[in-house]
Amino acid sequence: MQRYELIRLIGKGGMGEVYLAHDKACSRRVALKRIREDLSGNALLRQRFLREAKIAADLIHPGIVPVYSICSDGEAVYYTMPYIEGFSLKSLLKSVWQKEVLSKELEEKTSVKSFLPIFDKICATVEYIHSKGVLHRDLKPDNILLGLFGEVVIIDWGAAIFKHAKELKLEQDDEAAVSFDERNICYSSMTIPGKIVGTPDYMAPESLLGVEASEKTDIYALGLILYQMLTLAFPYRRKKGRKLSYRDVVLPPIEMSPYREIPPSLSQIAMKAIAINPADRFSSIQELRQALQPYLQGDPEWTVKATLMAKEKSCWKYYDPILLSRYFPVLASSPAQWYNFMLSEVEISASTRVEYTVTKSAVHEGMGILFLPSKEAERGEFYCGYGLWFSVQNHELTVSLIKNGIEIQKKSQEMISQQSRFAILIEKSDNRIAVFVEQALFILHIDYLPSLGNRLGVIIQDLQGMSNIAISESIGALRVSCLAVPDAFLSEKLYDQAAIFYRKIRDSFPGRKESYEAQFRLGVTLLTQIEEQGGDLTQALSSFDYLHGGAGAPLEYLGKALVYQRNGSFVEEIRCLLFALKRYSQHPEIPRLEDHLCFRLYDSLHKHRSEALVFMLLILWIAPEKISVREEERFLRIIYHKQQATLFCQVDKAPLQFRSSKMELFLSFWTGFSLFLPELFRRAGGLRDYQALADIFYVAGVSGNREAFMQFSTALANVSDEITFPESLHNQKVAELMFFVKGVEALRNKDYQKAKKLLWKTPFTLQLYALDMFHIQAFLDEEIESFIDLLQAIYDPASEEERDHILVYIIQTHLWNRDLERAYKLLNDRFPLDEELAEYSEAFILWGCYLALTGDRVVVKAHFSRCRYKYGKSALIGKCVDGDIFDYLDNLVWWEKKMTLFQSYFLLRCLNESPRRYEKYRQAYLSMENNFFD
């Protein structure tokens, strides 16, 4: 030990002594632990001491002091480690024992709130050593060191051992099985060197009776430490060495120290950890830590506020039969069915838990749970707020989350076929709703504002199948949001009072989340107030300017998007959301914007289908994980007709996959949303995907986005010598694509002979794309002969299958030239009227144009009146016979608007309408934006 100079003794344990020492070689202070002189001759204890050092040296964790060196030469047996300034957990607990009044500092240090993070760090360290196969076997406050700078470390590894080690077997007196019922056990607070390893006060009952140590014996010791942290007292009150009956003396922490305001379930956690029977304890440290997480995160403690009996009318303010469609109009259940509707007499708080069980048969036709704002509920407006719809079909449970009558989330899961009843738990807290079925999380939804529902409603057919409903509210959260007060005012629509408190919170916490959250909610409060009381909604924009460039910057744009949404400025709404998502992509508040996008998608599906495809595209691009597989199937059904009417989907027979670049291109095409086209082009080029590149050129060209078309042409020319597409893509070369690009430019410049020569060198798909781009321009400019010439040049060498794609253009030219005989023959042969024609098909429109040329306007109107979708594209084209349709165009997607204008122009020409009428549609088409934002 010549290298070390001992300064002073700083600790003494069962086997060793710890000194503060000076390391002369490194010129630093270290902690030196050596075996006690009176035990140095004991070979077993000497071996255990060295094992302690080696175990500590093998473990690397912030909660374990690393070992610098180990010495076992001659009589000197010691090891060194860093010296950590601090104090033991025992000394902190001892400082408050038997004190009636604590200083403010000591009260804060020993509060439940302060102790729990320390305990979690201790558990994290023990969880780590268990993962390495090590048991500590002597966990106690004396062996927990609290550093001056926040360190929490476990010391004294003298009793530690690897599980299943031979030494563990040698230390046991008896390997026989032991029963734990009513044993008299002797306790002591000192580690006993010898056969019994550990400190009896902190040893599990089975360890004192000679049973092999395990993870659960360490869990027991941790439970005692937690008990002391909660109560500031030890669970046993007896003299040293006295025998006592364990089961008779341990009081739950909540009873031991009622003044400490210990949440009941936290008290139960401690009692479970120190259960007399190991089987009743936590199965692992991980399970113990998971049980503590709600308290570490400040989640609430729940207490039952009311119990509602489904068949007891006195529990309900409103109890009547209703038709389902009034409350859940979007659901598949028959709206003609009658259900029992109950509205709770008791009001529920902002943080509420609803628990009940229900039979499978009771929800066969569905049941609903509603969270309704009081004022709306009083007026009978039961469709406001949030609702949940549960249904079981074919052993599959489906849960739908409804907001203001709109289904915004849906999840299904198979159930155990024999299961006849299941437990449901719903937690509504602040801006969060969580649904648990059989203790498993089923749905989680986070809104951008607190949920305002404070009445509980129930819709069900079979009252016999539903248990009583327990309504609990939070009482024991370790932290309560300062926003709770203004949120309560907002829920009651006391806007002025809410605004006052939001401003106070904003000014009281500068630079913190509470500040920007308060400002955001202030903005939404003002917006809601203006909307309800009347006024200019854009006045609320300035309240969100306060968030600009600060910690909550994305919320500025979310708030402004809300203003534009309610003001009907869809393009500006999208601009705001895109700006925030692009500029602050890594910001922790971005998930709130993603959730808002999801809500807007589902909302627009029921209100503005023209907007829904834009939100679908944004979610696919930014947060595809938000859409479940079942929702994918639903969305594919919604866009099926548009897929059938899309040329590049007709050419490629492969099914359109929802999560694919082609779907993103499809949505970009229909919405005119060209922002993502450059990235799609780059992606397709990187994959050497010839067909995808051709599709992107087509979308840019047919939508009139000349800037994007030329940008892609330049990019393609720059790599034309570097890329050759593989054999699997028909061995097409970049040169062919360049011929196509130049051919389209020649058509645009009306150099038709050059265009024909260039397009002759391209495959049929590219010729078809060029033809489709040119045909609208030709009809609008009334240059039909040039179009017919190009059409014939492409038609003649084409195969029969390829000619089918060209047929509609041929019919159009016959109709334009009043060649009714040829037009009728082609229409009747290929698309006979006696067959059911899809109204979204091009043939349906062409039949309408043919009937218009026969001169019978009544027949034309009758033809278009067959449309099921009264404000769909085909129906609107029919409406132009008697009047203008411009006021209806907002119901259509961007590309539908363009095609409706063109086909209305074409129909009016066929009807021999005055130039003044059809010219309006021609000019409207030409003046329409080339893309979403122009």
UniProtKB/Swiss-Prot annotation:
Catalytic function, reaction form: L-seryl-[protein] + ATP = O-phospho-L-seryl-[protein] + ADP + H(+); L-threonyl-[protein] + ATP = O-phospho-L-threonyl-[protein] + ADP + H(+)
Query: Care to name a GO molecular-function term for this sequence?
Result: protein serine/threonine kinase activity
List, alphabetically, the NCBIfam families matched.
Answer: PRK13184.1 (NF009651)
Q: Could you tell me what this protein is called? A: Serine/threonine-protein kinase PknD
Q: Does the keyword Transport apply?
A: no
Q: Does the keyword RNA-binding apply?
A: no
Give the UniProt keywords, A-Z.
Answer: ATP-binding, Kinase, Nucleotide-binding, Phosphoprotein, Serine/threonine-protein kinase, Transferase
Q: Which Gene3D superfamilies does the record cross-reference, listed alphabetically?
A: Phosphorylase Kinase, domain 1, Tetratricopeptide repeat domain, Transferase(Phosphotransferase) domain 1
Q: Which SUPFAM superfamilies match?
A: Protein kinase-like (PK-like)
PTM summary from the entry reads:
Autophosphorylated on serine and threonine residues.
Task: State the organism of origin.
Answer: Chlamydia trachomatis serovar D (strain ATCC VR-885 / DSM 19411 / UW-3/Cx)
Q: What is its EC number?
A: 2.7.11.1
Q: What does this protein do?
A: Together with the serine/threonine kinase Pkn1, may play a role in the specific interactions with host proteins during intracellular growth. Autophosphorylates and also phosphorylates Pkn1.
